[in-house]
Amino acid sequence: MLFATLEHILTHISFSTISIVITIHLITLLVRELGGLRDSSEKGMIVTFFSITGFLVSRWASSGHFPLSNLYESLISLSWALYILHTIPKIQNSKNDLSTITTPSTILTQGFATSGLLTEMHQSTILVPALQSQWLMMHVSMMLLSYATLLGGPPLSAAILIIRFRNNFHFFSKKKKNVLNKTFLFSDIKYFYAKRSALKRTSVPSFPNYYKYQLTERLDSWSYRVISLGFTLLTGGILGGAVWANEAWGAYWNWDPKETWAFITWTIFAIYLHSRTHPNWKGTNSALIASIGFLIIWICYFGINLLGIGLHSYGSFTLTPK
């Protein structure tokens, strides 16, 4: 009873704190003069991290096993892993572009975990026989960490696509406008004003374009590093799961829905990493592949749990009747 009460308190503290954090982020985006509030949001993230950590320790102590046996526990652990990902740029003293992804991702996963949909999983239960193995912590934790990193990297690639799409859209808009000017002889009328500002345009660098270039390069670098880490963790998790499957079911691979989608996910991100080595594919094409991988990883992690089919259906749930 004590552990259950402690877990309930810590869960709601973390959710309340992270709700305040996301509110502060929205305020600082809308009102730039209040940029000093960002320090408060970082303190809130620290409080959230320790609350989630306390919950996981309490659940581990009360259940006697690593808290990754169902969807509720995995979502809480995913929030914890996303915060770890959030702190990586701070350790390296670099610009934290990842926070734009990890902060909302944390509140979404934490919000869903504490919603009424997973009430049946809030109480700790005894592990099913197939999960009573020393491989539980190694395999499931590595897979969960890979999900967290692979959910953090691809959105940065998607941001690159959006920035470049907007640039191309403006380019074609200007090109169409130039055609109209030539057709209706508007270019002669604007010649005087264009000539007068020609010196400024040639001598002063295009700061917005230079900023966009720096931003896309930084996003591309972070996306590549995060996805590379996630791919490594995913590979280790799949290999560990294969060994565990052989012990539990007598076969290394069963083409279970979860295993199939894990293989598809691994293949997509392997193609992404390979595309980075090809000059013609590096950039927009590789970013598109990473964006596709983002959708695939959600199906692999969350979709199979919703369906509740196959050998990996321990984390599935049913809606609680009202």
Swiss-Prot record:
Keyword annotations for this protein, in alphabetical order, are:
Chloroplast, Cytochrome c-type biogenesis, Membrane, Plastid, Thylakoid, Transmembrane, Transmembrane helix
A single GO cellular-component term on record:
chloroplast thylakoid membrane
> What domain of life?
Eukaryota
User: Which Cys pairs does UniProt list as disulfide-bonded?
Assistant: none
- Provide the topology term for how it sits in the membrane: Multi-pass membrane protein
Query: What NCBIfam families does the database record attribute to this sequence?
Result: cytochr_II_ccsB
The Swiss-Prot or TrEMBL record describes its family as follows: Belongs to the CcmF/CycK/Ccl1/NrfE/CcsA family.
Q: What does this protein do?
A: Required during biogenesis of c-type cytochromes (cytochrome c6 and cytochrome f) at the step of heme attachment.
Name this polypeptide is given:
Cytochrome c biogenesis protein CcsA
Species of origin: Triticum aestivum (Wheat)
> Lineage, please?
Eukaryota, Viridiplantae, Streptophyta, Embryophyta, Tracheophyta
The record's gene field reads ccsA
